[in-house]
UniProtKB/Swiss-Prot annotation:
CDD domains membership: ATP-synt_Fo_b (cd06503)
Domain of life: Bacteria
GO CC, any one term: proton-transporting ATP synthase complex
This protein's name: ATP synthase subunit b
Function: F(1)F(0) ATP synthase produces ATP from ADP in the presence of a proton or sodium gradient. F-type ATPases consist of two structural domains, F(1) containing the extramembraneous catalytic core and F(0) containing the membrane proton channel, linked together by a central stalk and a peripheral stalk. During catalysis, ATP synthesis in the catalytic domain of F(1) is coupled via a rotary mechanism of the central stalk subunits to proton translocation. Component of the F(0) channel, it forms part of the peripheral stalk, linking F(1) to F(0).
Family: Belongs to the ATPase B chain family.
Membrane topology: Single-pass membrane protein
Main location per the UniProt record: membrane
Subunit structure: F-type ATPases have 2 components, F(1) - the catalytic core - and F(0) - the membrane proton channel. F(1) has five subunits: alpha(3), beta(3), gamma(1), delta(1), epsilon(1). F(0) has three main subunits: a(1), b(2) and c(10-14). The alpha and beta chains form an alternating ring which encloses part of the gamma chain. F(1) is attached to F(0) by a central stalk formed by the gamma and epsilon chains, while a peripheral stalk is formed by the delta and b chains.
Organism annotation: Xanthomonas euvesicatoria pv. vesicatoria (strain 85-10) (Xanthomonas campestris pv. vesicatoria)
Membrane-spanning residues: 3-23
Amino acid sequence: MDITLTIFAQALAFAGLIWIVATKIWPPLLQAIEERQQKIAEGLAAADRSQKDLAQAQEKVNEALKDARTKANEIIDQAHARANQIIEAAKLEAIAEANRQKDLAQTEIDASATRAREELRKQVSVLAVSGAEKLLKREIDANAHKALLDELAAEI
Protein backbone atom coordinates (compact mmCIF):
# COMPACT_ATOMS: atom_id res chain seq x y z
CA MET A 1 0.00 0.00 0.00
CA ASP A 2 1.04 3.34 -0.90
CA ILE A 3 1.45 6.00 1.78
CA THR A 4 -0.88 8.34 -0.06
CA LEU A 5 -3.57 5.76 -0.12
CA THR A 6 -3.03 5.09 3.57
CA ILE A 7 -3.25 8.77 4.44
CA PHE A 8 -6.31 9.11 2.23
CA ALA A 9 -7.97 6.11 3.93
CA GLN A 10 -7.14 7.45 7.34
CA ALA A 11 -8.47 10.88 6.38
CA LEU A 12 -11.63 9.26 5.09
CA ALA A 13 -11.99 7.21 8.29
CA PHE A 14 -11.36 10.33 10.37
CA ALA A 15 -13.97 12.27 8.39
CA GLY A 16 -16.43 9.43 8.91
CA LEU A 17 -15.68 9.48 12.62
CA ILE A 18 -16.20 13.24 12.74
CA TRP A 19 -19.49 12.91 10.84
CA ILE A 20 -20.74 10.15 13.20
CA VAL A 21 -19.68 12.14 16.26
CA ALA A 22 -21.22 15.36 14.87
CA THR A 23 -24.55 13.76 13.93
CA LYS A 24 -25.06 11.03 16.49
CA ILE A 25 -23.02 11.80 19.64
CA TRP A 26 -22.56 15.58 19.72
CA PRO A 27 -26.27 16.72 19.70
CA PRO A 28 -27.33 14.55 22.67
CA LEU A 29 -24.16 15.57 24.49
CA LEU A 30 -24.88 19.28 23.87
CA GLN A 31 -28.51 18.75 24.86
CA ALA A 32 -27.41 17.10 28.12
CA ILE A 33 -24.97 19.96 28.79
CA GLU A 34 -27.68 22.57 28.06
CA GLU A 35 -30.18 20.75 30.30
CA ARG A 36 -27.59 20.64 33.05
CA GLN A 37 -26.84 24.35 32.58
CA GLN A 38 -30.57 25.09 32.69
CA LYS A 39 -30.99 23.05 35.89
CA ILE A 40 -28.02 24.84 37.45
CA ALA A 41 -29.46 28.22 36.39
CA GLU A 42 -32.87 27.26 37.81
CA GLY A 43 -31.20 26.14 41.04
CA LEU A 44 -29.31 29.43 41.30
CA ALA A 45 -32.49 31.38 40.54
CA ALA A 46 -34.36 29.35 43.17
CA ALA A 47 -31.56 30.02 45.65
CA ASP A 48 -31.77 33.76 44.90
CA ARG A 49 -35.57 33.67 45.28
CA SER A 50 -35.17 31.74 48.52
CA GLN A 51 -32.71 34.31 49.82
CA LYS A 52 -35.08 37.13 48.88
CA ASP A 53 -38.00 35.26 50.46
CA LEU A 54 -35.90 34.65 53.56
CA ALA A 55 -35.01 38.35 53.74
CA GLN A 56 -38.68 39.30 53.33
CA ALA A 57 -39.72 36.75 55.94
CA GLN A 58 -37.05 38.08 58.29
CA GLU A 59 -38.34 41.62 57.75
CA LYS A 60 -41.90 40.45 58.43
CA VAL A 61 -40.74 38.65 61.57
CA ASN A 62 -38.88 41.75 62.75
CA GLU A 63 -41.95 43.89 62.03
CA ALA A 64 -44.19 41.42 63.85
CA LEU A 65 -41.81 41.40 66.83
CA LYS A 66 -41.75 45.19 66.82
CA ASP A 67 -45.56 45.30 66.73
CA ALA A 68 -45.76 42.68 69.47
CA ARG A 69 -43.36 44.65 71.66
CA THR A 70 -45.33 47.83 71.03
CA LYS A 71 -48.60 46.11 71.89
CA ALA A 72 -47.04 44.49 74.95
CA ASN A 73 -45.80 47.89 76.13
CA GLU A 74 -49.26 49.36 75.52
CA ILE A 75 -50.86 46.53 77.49
CA ILE A 76 -48.34 47.01 80.30
CA ASP A 77 -49.00 50.76 80.32
CA GLN A 78 -52.75 50.13 80.40
CA ALA A 79 -52.29 47.66 83.24
CA HIS A 80 -50.22 50.20 85.18
CA ALA A 81 -52.84 52.88 84.56
CA ARG A 82 -55.63 50.53 85.65
CA ALA A 83 -53.64 49.53 88.74
CA ASN A 84 -53.13 53.20 89.59
CA GLN A 85 -56.87 53.82 89.11
CA ILE A 86 -57.70 50.89 91.38
CA ILE A 87 -55.22 52.11 94.00
CA GLU A 88 -56.60 55.65 93.78
CA ALA A 89 -60.18 54.37 94.07
CA ALA A 90 -59.19 52.25 97.06
CA LYS A 91 -57.52 55.27 98.67
CA LEU A 92 -60.61 57.40 98.13
CA GLU A 93 -62.83 54.62 99.46
CA ALA A 94 -60.57 54.20 102.49
CA ILE A 95 -60.61 57.94 103.14
CA ALA A 96 -64.41 58.00 102.83
CA GLU A 97 -64.70 55.02 105.21
CA ALA A 98 -62.29 56.69 107.66
CA ASN A 99 -64.32 59.90 107.53
CA ARG A 100 -67.53 57.93 108.06
CA GLN A 101 -66.00 56.11 111.04
CA LYS A 102 -64.70 59.42 112.36
CA ASP A 103 -68.14 61.00 112.01
CA LEU A 104 -69.74 58.03 113.79
CA ALA A 105 -67.18 58.27 116.58
CA GLN A 106 -67.67 62.03 116.84
CA THR A 107 -71.45 61.54 116.99
CA GLU A 108 -71.00 58.95 119.72
CA ILE A 109 -68.61 61.25 121.60
CA ASP A 110 -71.07 64.14 121.31
CA ALA A 111 -73.91 61.93 122.54
CA SER A 112 -71.79 60.73 125.47
CA ALA A 113 -70.82 64.30 126.31
CA THR A 114 -74.47 65.37 126.18
CA ARG A 115 -75.46 62.47 128.43
CA ALA A 116 -72.64 63.32 130.82
CA ARG A 117 -73.69 66.99 130.91
CA GLU A 118 -77.29 65.99 131.59
CA GLU A 119 -76.12 63.65 134.34
CA LEU A 120 -73.94 66.41 135.80
CA ARG A 121 -76.87 68.86 135.67
CA LYS A 122 -79.01 66.38 137.52
CA GLN A 123 -76.28 65.85 140.10
CA VAL A 124 -75.64 69.60 140.38
CA SER A 125 -79.34 70.27 140.79
CA VAL A 126 -79.56 67.55 143.45
CA LEU A 127 -76.50 69.01 145.19
CA ALA A 128 -77.89 72.54 144.91
CA VAL A 129 -81.21 71.44 146.39
CA SER A 130 -79.35 69.52 149.10
CA GLY A 131 -77.13 72.51 149.79
CA ALA A 132 -80.12 74.84 149.94
CA GLU A 133 -81.84 72.49 152.36
CA LYS A 134 -78.78 72.43 154.58
CA LEU A 135 -78.48 76.19 154.44
CA LEU A 136 -82.09 76.66 155.34
CA LYS A 137 -81.91 74.16 158.17
CA ARG A 138 -78.96 75.83 159.83
CA GLU A 139 -78.95 79.14 161.33
CA ILE A 140 -77.92 81.97 159.14
CA ASP A 141 -74.22 82.44 159.75
CA ALA A 142 -71.66 83.81 157.24
CA ASN A 143 -68.94 81.36 158.26
CA ALA A 144 -71.31 78.40 158.01
CA HIS A 145 -72.50 79.58 154.61
CA LYS A 146 -68.93 79.88 153.40
CA ALA A 147 -68.05 76.38 154.66
CA LEU A 148 -71.15 74.88 153.02
CA LEU A 149 -70.42 76.59 149.71
CA ASP A 150 -66.82 75.37 149.81
CA GLU A 151 -68.08 71.85 150.54
CA LEU A 152 -70.52 72.06 147.59
CA ALA A 153 -67.78 73.36 145.32
CA ALA A 154 -65.56 70.45 146.33
CA GLU A 155 -68.35 67.96 145.56
CA ILE A 156 -68.92 69.48 142.14
